[in-house]
Amino acid sequence: MESRKLISATDIQYSASLLNSLNEQRGHGLFCDVTVIVEDRKFRAHRNILSASSTYFHQLFSVAGQVVELSFIRAEIFAEILNYIYSSKVVRVRADLLDELIKSGQLLGVKFIAELGVPLSQVKSISGTEQDGTAETLPSSSSDKSLDMEKSKDEAQDNGATVMPIITESFSLSAEDNEMKKIIVTDSDDDDDDDVIFCSEILPAKEDLPSNNTATQVQPNPASVAISEVTPCASNNSPPVTNITPTQLPTPVNQATLSQTQGSEELLVSSASTHLTPNIILLNQAPLTAPPSASSSLPNHMSSSVNVLVQNQQTPNSAVLTGNKAEEEEEIIDDDDDIISSSPDSAVSNTSLVPQADNSKSTTLDGSLTQKMQIPVLPQEPPSNSLKISDVITRNTNDPGLRSKHVMEGQKIITLDTATEIEGLSTGCKVYANIGEDTYDIVIPVKDDPDGGEAKLDNELPKTSGSEPPNKRMKVKHDDHYELIVDGRVYYICIVCKRSYVCLTSLRRHFNIHSWEKKYQCRYCDKVFPLAEYRTKHEIHHTGERRYQCLTCGKSFINYQFMSSHIKSVHSQDPSGDSKLYRLHPCKSLQIRQYAYLSNKSSAMPVMKDDAVGYKVDAGKEPPVGTTSTPPQNKSTFWEDIFIQQENDSIFKQNVTDGSTEFEFIIPESY
C-alpha cells in the first residue's frame, strides 16, 4: 500500500485582492444591495460586507430593508469608515477629526477604529488640543506631515529593518500565537498637513529580550513624541518588560543618557506639566467576557516603579527612549491579565495615573521634572469587572463620626475630577455629581461576601486597627449596569454600551441585546431576535403590510426608511420636522395580544400573592349614581385574570365592545 501525501497551500495575497475587488465593485455600483443615507449623501455598499465589519449593521440589516438612514454620524466621518471597511486602511485623516472618528467607530461597532484611541492617546502630537494652556502644540512646520493608518501583517524579522520610533503594545494571547501589536510613528517630507501612523500586527520571534537597551537620540519633527509602554509579557514565567526598538534619525539636536535601574523602567516624555491633585487611584477595567465571580488581587510586593521625566525647554527637542528589563524571576504574569485594560471602555491611559500628585515634583535636570508612579503587576488569576484601588485617600472631613459611619456600612468615598474617569469604574459603584465643584463622588461597596468565593488578602489589616487595607477587593453587585446620580435623580447606565435609562426595568430589557437571555424567534422563518419589537419589524417583511402612509400623496410604505426617502425625494420635505407628513397605522396582519379593559373599579388595591401584580385604575373617579361600591374581597389576582387572551379573534380591536367609553388599561404587546 503506497503512502499518500497531503499538500496544503495558502494564498497570502487573497484577502487583499478580494478587498480590492470588492472596493472596485462598490466604486462602480456593481452588486450593491443596500443604500446608506447619511445627511445629504447616499452610499452604495454590500450588505454582507457591512454586516461582517460592523456589529451595528449586523443587527440593523436583520430587520431593515435595502435603504437605511443614519442620523447620529456625519457623512464625512462615515465615508472614512466605509473606506476602511473596503480597504482595511484609514488614510489621511485630519487630526481634529480623530476623536469623532473613534466615537463613530464605537457606535457602529467597528473594532479597529473603536480601539484606535488607546494607542493614539500615547502620542501627544496627534491630539491637537492644549492642556492647561501650557502644553506644546503643533507648529506651522507640521504642515509637512501626513497621517496614514495601515493595518497589515508582517514577519517578525521585518522588525529590525525600520528606521522610525516604535510604540509596542502587548496583548495576552495563547501560547501558540503570542501575537503583539505595534504602532510605528514616523514623519515624512511630503507636502501634506497630517501626521503618518502605520499600525501593523506582527508575530515576534520567541527569544528573550536583551537586558539592557541603549538610549538613542531621535530627531523627529518638532513636538512629535515617542513613548514606550510598560506592559506585561504574554508568556508565562517572564517579568514585565518595556518593548522598545531604538532608532536614530539624521541631525540629532541633543543627547542624554539615563542610568539604568534594576527592576524599573524609565520613560522620557516631552510635554508640559498639567494640573494635578493629591489623590492617586488606579483603575482597571477587565474584559466583559470575564466571569464576575473571578477577581484578581494586587499584592504590595508585586509592583514595578516607573519614573516619568518631563522636559520643559524653550526650543522643541526630541524624546529619548530607554528601558530596562526587570530581573524578578518569581513574578508570574497570567496570559489573560493586563496592567490596565486597552478596551475602549477603559477611560484611563496605560502610562498615566489619574489624578496625579502636584506636590511630588523635584528638579533633576535643566528645567526638567521627575515624578515617581507605581504600576501594579497582576498575579496569576483571572480578571474580573472589579475596581482596583491603590492608596485611596478618603475624602477629607472634620466629622469623625461621618467617616466611621461609611466604614461601618461597608462604603468608601473617593473623588474624581473628570467625568471621563467614571467609565473605568466597576459595577456596583454609585456616582454622585457635584455640579458646583465639577467633581464626582464615588461610593464604593467594600463589604466581603462570604458566598462570593473571594479569599481575603494575606496582608489584610484587622478591622479593629481602624485603617482599611489599600488593596481590598471589591464585590461586584451588578453585572449589567452602574448607577449615576445627578441632582438626586438616578440614572442607570448600561455597562456595555453606556446607554442611560431612568427606569431599571427598561435597562434590564435593553440588556437582553447583549446577554441574549431571552430569544424571540420569527413565526415565519428561523431568525431569532433579542427584543420583541425587532421581531415585529422583521415579521412585517413577511406579511408585506404597509403601515406608513404619506399624507401628501396617500402612498403607503413598509417601513419608515422607504417613507422618509419618498418624502425627501418626491415632495422635497423633511419628515422629521415639526409638521406631520405621515401616518402610522396599527398593525393588522400580526398576532398581537389583545388589550385588556378593566370596567370594575375598586377603591383599594386587591390582595396579591408574591408572584402577582395588581394595578389601581381610575382611583380618583367617583362611582356612577345609583351604584353601590362593594368592599374589596380577599381574592388573589393573577396575570391571566388581567390579560384576557381570546383564541378566535387575533386581530387588534380599536373599539371597545363592553360598553365602556374610554381606554382604562392599556399595555402594548411590544413593551
UniProtKB/Swiss-Prot annotation:
Residues 1-103 are annotated as: Interaction with NCOR1. Transmembrane segments: none annotated. The keyword Oxidoreductase does not apply. The keyword Protease does not apply. Residues 32-94 form the BTB domain. The modification Phosphothreonine is found at T251. Residues 127-144, 347-365 have a biased composition (Polar residues). Residues 298-571 are annotated as: Interaction with CBFA2T3. One of its GO terms (biological process) is negative regulation of DNA-templated transcription. Residues 127-161, 332-365, 451-474 are annotated as: Disordered. Disulfide bonds: none annotated. Residues 145-156, 451-461 have a biased composition (Basic and acidic residues). Interacts with NCOR1. Self-associates. Interacts with CTNND1, and this interaction inhibits binding to both methylated and non-methylated DNA. Interacts with CTNND2. Interacts with KPNA2/RCH1, which may mediate nuclear import of this protein. Interacts with CBFA2T3. Transcriptional regulator with bimodal DNA-binding specificity. Binds to methylated CpG dinucleotides in the consensus sequence 5'-CGCG-3' and also binds to the non-methylated consensus sequence 5'-CTGCNA-3' also known as the consensus kaiso binding site (KBS). May recruit the N-CoR repressor complex to promote histone deacetylation and the formation of repressive chromatin structures in target gene promoters. Contributes to the repression of target genes of the Wnt signaling pathway. May also activate transcription of a subset of target genes by the recruitment of CTNND2. This is Transcriptional regulator Kaiso. It comes from Mus musculus. The gene is Zbtb33.
